[in-house]
Amino acid sequence: MPKPGILKSKSMFCVIYRSSKRDQTYLYVEKKDDFSRVPEELMKGFGQPQLAMILPLDGRKKLVNADIEKVKQALTEQGYYLQLPPPPEDLLKQHLSVMGQKTDDINK
């Protein structure tokens, strides 16, 4: 029990929504169904938010696909964090790189 006059620090949570328009795109906000700090244009492009999860950030060291410190900072400063999908793999570039290495090995 906290001592009188000492306030217990507020836990930090975020609410994560999946985009209905863009695959692998997520919007993190501070409170459930509160998009008041999210720019209108972003919301139009995001589509109807679909609740994915509510996540406590305190005591957590990392998130799967986002830098937790950037998420916390964005939530505090602007009230939201937008997680975009990772860039697509360039399979042709990877293949050509491997083929180039094999050619170099053959020429040695």
Swiss-Prot record:
It holds the Pfam family YcgL. Residues 12-96 form the YcgL domain. PANTHER family: PROTEIN YCGL. This is Protein YcgL.
